[in-house]
Amino acid sequence: MAKKSIVNRNLKRLKTVNKYAARRAEIVSILRDAGSDIEAKASARDLLQKLPRNASPVRLRQRCALTGRPRGVFSKFGLGRIKLREIAMRGEIPGLIKASW
């Protein structure tokens, strides 16, 4: 089980990312537009730097929904490898079976 403070920090970052997502998308579209002039891009870059650090989606960490484990998380299920195996062995995930060859 991960520390609750770390899990809560990640949730706080997720809220910040969602809060600034639209504003960030507008600024990034100005920066990526080939037709915009240099002054507009410079001002957009300044606006992007003024946003909070945690508004960047890169700072989010994918964690297990049950335990908060940061590594070995399957994005399709949102679970860590250990919990995924436990739940799959109980047959609670439809269509997921143990491989045998």
From Swiss-Prot:
Q: Which GO terms describe its biological process?
A: translation
Cited SUPFAM superfamilies? Glucocorticoid receptor-like (DNA-binding domain)
Alphabetic keyword roster: Ribonucleoprotein, Ribosomal protein, RNA-binding, rRNA-binding
A GO term from the CC aspect: cytoplasm
| Record carries keyword Translocase | no
Entry GO MF terms = rRNA binding; structural constituent of ribosome
Signal peptide as annotated in the record: none
Any Pfam family the entry gives = Ribosomal_S14
Query: Domain of life of the organism in this record?
Result: Bacteria
Summary of subunit composition and partner proteins: Part of the 30S ribosomal subunit. Contacts proteins S3 and S10.
Entry's family note: Belongs to the universal ribosomal protein uS14 family.
HAMAP family cross-referenced by the UniProt entry: Ribosomal_uS14_1
Q: Briefly, what is this protein's role?
A: Binds 16S rRNA, required for the assembly of 30S particles and may also be responsible for determining the conformation of the 16S rRNA at the A site.
Q: What is this protein called?
A: Small ribosomal subunit protein uS14
Organism of this sequence: Nitrosomonas europaea (strain ATCC 19718 / CIP 103999 / KCTC 2705 / NBRC 14298)
What lineage is this protein's organism placed in? Bacteria, Pseudomonadati, Pseudomonadota, Betaproteobacteria, Nitrosomonadales
The coding gene here is rpsN
